[in-house]
């Protein structure tokens, strides 16, 4: 895709985005992520990030 107004390619999708969304849907994981960061919060709730 191209940004319509800027004329350059869109950035590559974040490979962690799916895991970030899973963590955001869990209120406890989301709250912990606010304090210690997404990757560490995800690891504590779901295993390896």
UniProtKB/Swiss-Prot annotation:
Ranges of residues in domain Gla: 1-47
Q: Which residues bind Ca(2+) 2?
A: 21, 24
Q: Name one GO molecular function term.
A: hydroxyapatite binding
* Residues bearing the modification Hydroxyproline: 9
Q: Which annotated residues bind Ca(2+) 1?
A: 17
In this chain, where does the modification 4-carboxyglutamate occur? Answer: 17, 21, 24
List the cysteine pairs that form cystine.
Answer: 23-29
Which biological process, per GO, is one annotated for this protein? brain development
Cellular component terms per the entry's GO annotation: cytoplasm; extracellular region
Q: Where in the cell is it found?
A: Secreted
Against SUPFAM superfamilies, the record matches this protein to: GLA-domain
Keyword line: Biomineralization, Calcium, Disulfide bond, Gamma-carboxyglutamic acid, Hormone, Hydroxylation, Metal-binding, Secreted
Q: What modifications follow translation?
A: Gamma-carboxyglutamate residues are formed by vitamin K dependent carboxylation by GGCX. These residues are essential for the binding of calcium. Decarboxylation promotes the hormone activity.
Q: Which InterPro entries match?
A: GLA-like_dom_SF, GLA_domain, Osteocalcin, Osteocalcin/MGP
Q: What does this protein do?
A: The carboxylated form is one of the main organic components of the bone matrix, which constitutes 1-2% of the total bone protein: it acts as a negative regulator of bone formation and is required to limit bone formation without impairing bone resorption or mineralization. The carboxylated form binds strongly to apatite and calcium. The uncarboxylated form acts as a hormone secreted by osteoblasts, which regulates different cellular processes, such as energy metabolism, male fertility and brain development. Regulates of energy metabolism by acting as a hormone favoring pancreatic beta-cell proliferation, insulin secretion and sensitivity and energy expenditure.
Its family? Belongs to the osteocalcin/matrix Gla protein family.
The name this protein goes by in its record: Osteocalcin
Q: Which organism is it from?
A: Notamacropus eugenii
């Amino acid at each position: 895709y191209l940004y319509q107004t800027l004329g350059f390619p869109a950035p590559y999708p974040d490979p962690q985005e799916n895991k970030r969304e899973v963590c955001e849907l869990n209120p406890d994981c989301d709250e912990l992520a606010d304090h210690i960061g997404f990757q560490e919060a995800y690891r504590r709730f779901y295993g390896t990030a």
